[in-house]
Amino acid sequence: MYERRPIAQLPDLLISQIAAGEVIERPASVLKEILENAIDAGARAIEIRLEGGGIRRIAVSDDGFGIPPEELPLAVAQHATSKIRSLSELESVASMGFRGEALASIASVARLTIISRVRNGDHAWQIDASSGEISPASGPPGTTVDVRQLFDNVPARRKFLRSEATEFGHCLDALERIALANPQIAFRLFHHDKAQRQWLPADPGQRIRDVLGAEFAGQALPVDTRYGAIGLMGMVTRPTAARARADRQYLYVNGRYVRDRTVSHALRSAYADVLHGDRQPAYVLYLEVDPAAVDVNVHPAKHEVRFRDSGAVHRFVSQVVGQALAQTGGAQALDAEDPPPEPIRPETPPPPSLSPAAALPSAPAQPPAAPYPSRPHSQMPFRLQEPAGVSARDWQSLYRPLAEPGATPQTADRPQAAAPARLVSEEEHPLGMALGQLHGVYILAQNARGLVLVDMHAAHERVVYEQLKHALDERSLPRQDLLVPVVFHAQEKDVALAEEYAEQLSELGFEMRPSGPTSIAVRSVPALLARGDIEGLARAVLRDLGAVGASQLLTEQRNELLSTMACHGSVRANRRLTIEEMNALLRQMEATERADQCNHGRPTWIQWTVNDLDKLFLRGQ
C-alpha cells in the first residue's frame, strides 16, 4: 500500500535527466544534437573526434558564428535557444533545433565543456557545464563542444550501451545521415585520433556517391520534380538493386532526417509491381514543403513529422518516384558507365559494293531444327488476328501485339530467317538485334555493348501488363452497383473516414456510406474487383485512409488482377519465335515502361559486355 506523498517541484537536474531519457539514448544521439547545433550556427567545416565509440569522448568543432561569452551560461540552461521567439516561429521553424534542451540534457548525463569564439572576438571563452564557470581559452572562431564519460553518473543507462564498435557504428550512421542532408559542409571524422571519414563540400549527387559509394550511385535514378510549394529531389535505386534490408533508406523533410509512414507508404506504392518478394528499395530523397505545412514538434528526438495534407504529399511522392522508375526497357544499357567496346574489325574489310543482303547467310527453306527437345507442333502466328469491327482501344486486344500495329503477322510457311530489307545497327536499339532462341525460353540478342539475354515470357508479360494498365487508365474505371449492399459493423472513426473521403472513393468506383452510427454500407465497387472480399477490401481501404490519408489499395488490387491476366496472355516457354518476332518483342520492351522487370519484380533481361565475355575466356590476360 503506497502512502500519499505531497506534490513537489522537481529539481532542475532531475528535469534535465528526464528530458535526456527522451532525447539521449546513446552516443549517436549526443552526436546528432551537437551536429545539428553546428549546422544551425552556419558552419561550413565540422570535425568530429570520438573515443571509445563516443562513450568516453565526443568532441565536435565547427567554424560557425560562435557564442558570445555572456550567452554561454544560457547555452547550457534549460529551454534557452536562439532559434525561436514565438508560436508563429515554432509553427514554421526551419532550423534543426528549436527546443533549447539538448545541451542541458547532455550536461545532466555527462561532463560537458564548451569553447567558443565569435568571428570578431579577440579570443575564445570556455564554460564548464557542471560548475557554470567561464574562463578565457584559446581557439579559432567557431565552437567546440566536448562531451566526456557519457552516463557515468547514470549507471542504469550506461549498462544498456553496447560495445565500442557497435556504438561507433551508430555514430557513423548518424554522421552519414547529416552529411547527406548538408553536402555544402565539409566533415572529418576521427576515432582514437585515426581518420575514418572525410567528405569535402560537393553537390548533392557527388555527396551521395561519396557517402554511399559508387555502387549505390551507379544503380540510382535521379529524381528532381517541383510543383508549386512542394518538391522532391534525390536518387532512388533501380528495382534490380533492391536490398534484403531497409538499411539504405534516407528521407529528409526540409533538410531534416525523418521516418515518416506517409512517405514510406507512398514509396512502397511506387515500387509495388517492380520489386521481387520482400526486397527493399534504397533511396536518398529530399522532400521540400512549406515549413508552415509540416509540424516537426511531434517527437522528442524530432524523428517524425506530421503533414497538414498528408494525402497530397502521398500522391506527389508516389507519382514522382513512379515516373522515375518508369524508364523503358533497355534504358540501363544506355545509362551504363563503361563505354561500348570498339567493334572487332577484320584486317581486310569487305568490298564497299557488297550489299547488306549478300552479307547475310542464305535463309533455309524450312526452319532449322530446334536445339531443345520439343513436341511436334505447327507454327502459329505470334500476333493474333484482329477481329473485324473490334476497336483498337478494346483492352482485350492488348493480349496480341508483339509486332507493330500495322505489321503483317508471320505465317507458318514463311522462312524463319528471312533477310530484312536493311541491316539495322544494334547501336540504334538498347536491346540490340535478336540472334536466336535458347531452349524456347530465352532470346539471345547483340547490342553495342555485347550480349543480351532476354526471358521472353517475363518480358512479354510486362509489355501486356503495362498495356492493360494504360488502357484502363485512359478511361473511367467501370463500377458495378451491388443488388444487395454489403453492410458491416465499423468503429465510429471508420464511419467518419467513409464520410470524409466519400468523393475520392467515388472517383475510384467505390461507394460506401454510413448506414448507422457504427455501420457502413458498400453500394458499388470497381467492376474488376466485384468478385472479391468486398468487406475486407473496404476495411483495408479505410485503414489506409486513416493511417496515411490516401489509399492505393484499389489500384493495387486492380493491378494484381491485370497482372494475372497478362501472365496468362503472354507467350509461353517452348514457343518457337521467328527472328522478326523476337525483334518485335525487343522493340516493344524498349517502348514499354518498367520493362526491365516482370510483374513480379524479376529481371527480364541481363547484359554481358564484350569485356565480360573476354574475361570468361581469359582474353587479354
From Swiss-Prot:
Q: What CDD domains does its record include? A: HATPase_MutL-MLH-PMS-like, MutL_Trans_MutL
UniProt superkingdom: Bacteria
Q: Which GO terms describe its biological process?
A: mismatch repair
Asked whether the keyword Oxidoreductase is assigned, the reply is no
Query: Compositional bias of type Pro residues: which residue ranges?
Result: 341-354, 364-374
Do you know which SUPFAM superfamilies this protein is assigned to?
Answer: ATPase domain of HSP90 chaperone/DNA topoisomerase II/histidine kinase (SSF55874), DNA mismatch repair protein MutL (SSF118116), Ribosomal protein S5 domain 2-like (SSF54211)
Q: List, in alphabetical order, the Gene Ontology terms for molecular function in this entry.
A: ATP binding; ATP hydrolysis activity; ATP-dependent DNA damage sensor activity; mismatched DNA binding
Which GO cellular component terms, listed alphabetically, does the Swiss-Prot or TrEMBL entry include?
mismatch repair complex
Q: Which Pfam families match?
A: DNA_mis_repair, HATPase_c_3, MutL_C
Keywords, A to Z? DNA damage, DNA repair
PANTHER family membership? DNA MISMATCH REPAIR PROTEIN MLH, PMS, MUTL, DNA MISMATCH REPAIR PROTEIN MLH1
Q: What does this protein do?
A: This protein is involved in the repair of mismatches in DNA. It is required for dam-dependent methyl-directed DNA mismatch repair. May act as a 'molecular matchmaker', a protein that promotes the formation of a stable complex between two or more DNA-binding proteins in an ATP-dependent manner without itself being part of a final effector complex.
- List the HAMAP family hit by this protein, alphabetically: DNA_mis_repair
| Family indicated by similarity | Belongs to the DNA mismatch repair MutL/HexB family.
Q: What is this protein called?
A: DNA mismatch repair protein MutL
